[in-house]
Swiss-Prot record:
Function recorded in the entry: RuBisCO catalyzes two reactions: the carboxylation of D-ribulose 1,5-bisphosphate, the primary event in carbon dioxide fixation, as well as the oxidative fragmentation of the pentose substrate in the photorespiration process. Both reactions occur simultaneously and in competition at the same active site. Although the small subunit is not catalytic it is essential for maximal activity.
Gene name for this UniProt entry: rbcS
Induction pattern: Expressed at a constant level during a 12 hours light:12 hours dark diurnal cycle (at protein level).
Name of the protein described by the UniProt record: Ribulose bisphosphate carboxylase small subunit
InterPro entries: RuBisCO_ssu_sf
Note: The basic functional RuBisCO is composed of a large chain homodimer in a 'head-to-tail' conformation. In form I RuBisCO this homodimer is arranged in a barrel-like tetramer with the small subunits forming a tetrameric 'cap' on each end of the 'barrel'. In this alga, in contrast to plants, the small subunit is encoded in the chloroplast.
């Protein structure tokens, strides 16, 4: 899930996965 992709688009995919 990339619900945070919009707000965390500046972060790496690894961080995006951790935010989930």
């Amino acid at each position: 899930m990339r619900l945070t992709q919009g707000a965390f688009s500046y972060l790496p995919d690894l961080t995006d996965a951790q935010i989930i």
